[in-house]
Structure formats: C-alpha cells, structure tokens
Amino acid sequence: MLRVLQECEHVAADFSADPVHDLRVSLRRCRSLADGMIAMDPDRDWKAMKKAGKRLFQRLGALRDVQIMMEWIEKLRPAPARADAGESPALMETPAQKSEMSDGAPFAEPVTTDFGDPAAHLLLEILKGRETEQKREARAALAEFDRKQWRQWSRSLPLRAARIRPGSAVFKHLALERWTAARELHVRALRNRSQVAFHTLRIGIKRFRYIVENFLPAEHKAWSNDLKHMQDLLGEVHDLDVLWATALACHVFPDEASRKSWHAQILEERTRRINEYREKTVGPDSLWVAWRAGLPQGKQIEATATLRMKLWAKALDPDFAHSERVSRLALDLYDGLVAVGLLQFANADEARSSLQIAALLHDVGKSEGNKGHHKTSFELIRGHSNPLGWRPEYLLRAAIVARFHGGALPSRSHKTLRDLLPDELRITIQLAAILRLANAFDAVHDGHIRRVKIENSDTGKRRTNGFLRKPAKLPPNQALVIEAEGFVAGSTTAQAVAAERYLLETVLRRPVVVKAMKAAVPRGDGAEVKRIAS
C-alpha cells in the first residue's frame, strides 16, 4: 500500500505514461487484496480502501487509454527513420510488454516525431490534445486523493491481513472461485469471439492472477509468467479494438485505401494474439488445466468454504467459542434424532451441514448490538456472497435457521418463510428447533454442558447375533429423553432449556425431557464391587 503513495509522487511530476501505469497497477493490487480479504474479514476499512482506490483508478483511466493509443500508433505506423537516429526504443516493444512496476526507471513520453502516414499524424495530434485535457482531470483526481487516510490504512490493514497465513486453504478456495469465474468467461469468449467477451475475459484472468499474486506465493512462482502473458495478449487485443474504434470516430482516414490498410493491419495483429491465446488455453494440456490442478478438489471445496465462513463469523461474533459449542451440541442432537428415526431427510448430509453453518453463524448479528441480533444475523448471512461449493439456497436456509435461534417462533405465515416450498419449510423449522434447544444448553455462555445424547440411541448400527441392525425407532407418543453432561436441574440453563424445548416438542409431536447424563462406570470398577458384595 505504501507503493501507491510513492507512485503518487512520481505521477504528480509530469503525468507521463509510465508513472500513470505504475500507479494504476499499484491501486489495482491493493483493491485485489481488499477484494480477497473482504470475503473473510468484515472490517469496514477494507471496503473503504477499495472504494478510495477505485475512484482514483477510474479517474486515471481515460488518460491511460489515450497514452496507450499513442504508443500503439508509434508501433503500427512508425515515423520514417532518420539517417542520424537509431531505432526508437518505443517502437521495439508493445505497451503490454513494458514492466508493470518501473522500479524508479526514468519516465519517457511517447515519441512525437512526424509520421509519413497522414492518418497516423492526424490521430496522434487529436490524442495529444486529449492527453492534455485528461492530465488536468488526473491532476484534480490526485489532489482529491486522501493520502493521509491511505497511509493510516497502510499501517492497520496489513496487520489484519497477516492473521491469515498466505498459501492457506481458504486463499486457495478464493482463487478457485476466481478460476471458475474466469474459466466461464473463457468458454464464452471462444464461443462468440466478440470484443466485449474477450475484454471481460481479460478482467476475469486479471482477478484470478492478483488473488494468486497476493495470497498464494508458491502458485504465483509457478504460474506468474503464464498468467501475465495471457493477460497481456488479451489486453493488447482490447487496445487494438479501442484504437480502431477511436480512429473511425475521429474520421482520420483521407481515403478508403488508408482505412482498409489500417483495418487489415489491426486485424492481423489482433488475430495473431487471439490465436496465440487459443494455442495455450485449449486442450487437455492447456494452462487452464494446469492452474486447476493446483487448487482444491472434490470434498475439499465444501470443507474449505465452511472454514472461510467460520473465519468471517469469528471476526463478527463477540463470543465465537459459544457458537462453536452450540454447533457441537446441535450436531449431537441432530445425529441422535436421526438415529432414533424421528427426523428423516432426502439429503441428510446437506441438512446436517446447513445446521452446522447456522449454528456457527447464529450470533454474527451481535456485531451490531445485542437487541434483535437474530434478525441482524439473518441479514448479514443472507447478504454474504455464496462461497464456491455451496448452492445459494443452502446459504439461505442457514440464514433462516439462524434467524429463528431466538425471538419469535417460526410459523408458515412469517414473511421469511412464506415463500418456501412445503418440504423446505418442514426441514427449516426442524433445524431451527434443534438450534434453538442447542443454544439454550449454553444459555449462560460458560460451556458447562459438555455434550448431549438422546437416551437409548446409538448413532451407529448395532450388532445382533452377528448381523448389523438399525436402532429401533421410538414408539409413538413416547417422550424423547435427552441426557446432558453437566446439566443441573433448577439452574439458569435448565430454565432456558425448559422454555426453548417447546418448538422441538411441536416438531416431533411428543414431549421432550432433559436430565443429567449418568456418569459412565468403568467395567473394572463394577467387577470389583461384585466381588466385595459376594
């Protein structure tokens, strides 16, 4: 982030092409850092920094576009060589081949020698006029940029980013999200081959590249050259498209022959770059396949998505240890109820995961105050972007279940539930009933209820006469008995449990009884008692 302030000083000197480019690159990297951290750290400074960087970045964009077109004119239609001058360095490289960070190298303006091509000369003169105008706009934008605030962020935000180790699984999951989005843009661009599609693809690759660069050092070392080259190829395609559109709009061609000559040259350069991109990104050995191989696979995707959401919740929840305990207790209840046949789901694993996430996130709303926090939790969870590996309705279910961990009981007429299909409504209320009771078991946030168990249930299959058999279902109308380790009758926790078990009783259509869990007696001690008695 300090590099942005350094580049601001360079740009303020003369607003030439290289420092403007370097400042925009620095801003883009900071914005990409913020974009990645926002997914796991809800601190508002990330969003504020990203917004401030975006404002300056965009206001420098028009100037940068003009300067790029001037460089391309020099490359495509160079001035006639003079006998007393060697080849201009500016003509020996494309704009995208220049270094992204100049490391203090002297800044050089594009060569403005007279061109033999009248169209090139006229277009360059028009662009020089625009450059002067855009430099005034850029100077105003730079003056409005709050460097003092940026310096404060440069001290505080890197410390927050350091809490998550670079190269960790959560960053690989974030990179996979960017890879997936960019890959879809790649397929679309190769299918319709439009200018907009290739430009959007370049942006997608750029976002993937900066996540890798900022957060995955090992992958960056292996992939950086290829990622930058693919981005540069597509960037040059976009530059050529903009140059051609500008030349047409400015009516710089003196005749049809000149227009056709320009079009043919631009089309040739454009096609060559697209073909090179295709060669490296299509087929079983493509770069896309190589990049995907280094990112999470299979079940790792959903597990890492859960870890990302836990990190997000931990930053918001003032007592996340309580939420973790509630999650464990809720899963104990869920597994026991399924084992005795009182709950049945078409997709039991998904329902269990929904309950786990709802329990972990149920108190994130307390970041904005305790009053009505269950409603705030619902809004925060629902407003969170859907992590890769989860379906959108999966996160919405978790948000609704978390909404009803306290406050009013869920009903079909509630505005949050009225649009749910009958099966989804039933599942959501069942999970909310479990979470509500699990939360009551840790009502005082002290963790003295260590575990719970459905009496006479066995979460595994029992072996009888050499055969595995499922546990017997509870008979109709028989009370559900829950044993809780550390439960004390008459305590504050017992009162909370008595109040919150009602929803589960309604769902199961049977009474729920909670009692203290009996201490297990080791087998050896029991045998010793028998010998003494005899």
Model regions: which residues?
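Cationic, histidine-enriched alpha-helical/coil surfaces that engage anionic ligands
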Residues: 1-304
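Amphipathic, well-packed alpha-helical segments that form the structural scaffold of globular domains
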Residues: 2-9, 180-183, 187, 310, ...
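Intrinsic, low-complexity polybasic segments
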Residues: 85-89, 94, 102-105, 459-466, ...
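Regulatory/sensor and coupling segments of signal-transduction and defense proteins
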Residues: 300-314, 318-321, 325-330
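Divalent metal-dependent catalytic cores for phosphoryl transfer on phosphate-bearing substrates
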Residues: 313, 322, 334-454
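Low-complexity, glycine/alanine/valine/leucine- and proline-rich hydrophobic stretches
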Residues: 444, 448-457, 476-512
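A short amphipathic beta-strand at an alpha->beta junction
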Residues: 508-523, 531
